Amino acid sequence: MSDWMPIAKEYDPLKAGSIDGTDEDPHDRAVWRAMLARYVPNKGVTGDPLLTLFVARLNLQTKEEKLKEVFSRYGDIRRLRLVRDLVTGFSKGYAFIEYKEERALMKAYRDADGLVIDQHEIFVDYELERTLRGWIPRRLGGGLGGKKESGQLRFGGRDRPFRKPINLPVVKNEPHREGKRERRERSRSRDRHWDPRPRERDHDRGREKHWQERARVWPENDWEREREFREERVKSRDKRDRSK
């Protein structure tokens, strides 16, 4: 388990559908769909993918000027694209920002995630479509992150990193017959403290916050791993360029 990492270095739909990346069978149809999908990144996208950030959860009213004002604090911006609907022209709530220098990219990656812009807490990550090998977008059953309400959570990204697998011995419970008094006492205790939804929500929020914070801090606490990760992405891009 020494080579375990919370962030995926290669996209595997089956692993992405697992909270700790250890599932051996797909748990929903979307994972199956992603496993069978073949995706080719959009060749019309320009710019250096290794200097590009993905910015999501934007207020639909946020304009390009506002994004440029905020993200230029971290360094010189080469290109900024707020993705809009081709028909209506309305914002889709996410953007791509390309910096001129890697130092600016890394600073924005560390510091801009979680910023509040126009009353919305934004999410910042590297661009993955052209840099993460094997990438499958959400519309094909892949992607990373997501909300519980959508029923399509994907792990191994900054938003929802893999949790470290815990190997525990399986203990078989022997049959145990409760007496009437035991059952009655347990029933009374449950009735006195019955409030499942708030407790479950609080517990889930706490766990999600814990793992999100670990993902945010991880690059700062382990710069060597982060450098190796980015160097591998550079090598992968160079090989791809030479093969064209």
UniProtKB/Swiss-Prot annotation:
Swiss-Prot/TrEMBL keywords: Isopeptide bond, mRNA processing, mRNA splicing, Nucleus, RNA-binding, Spliceosome, Ubl conjugation
Any GO BP: mRNA processing
A GO cellular component entry from the record: U12-type spliceosomal complex
Organism: Mus musculus (Mouse)
UniProt GO molecular function: RNA binding
Lineage: Eukaryota, Metazoa, Chordata, Craniata, Vertebrata
Protein name: U11/U12 small nuclear ribonucleoprotein 35 kDa protein
RRM domain location: 51-129
InterPro entries (alphabetical): Nucleotide-bd_a/b_plait_sf, RBD_domain_sf, RRM_dom, snRNP35_RRM, U1_U11-U12_snRNP_70-35kDa
Numbered residues of crosslink Glycyl lysine isopeptide (Lys-Gly) (interchain with G-Cter in SUMO2): K172
Record region (Disordered): 146-244
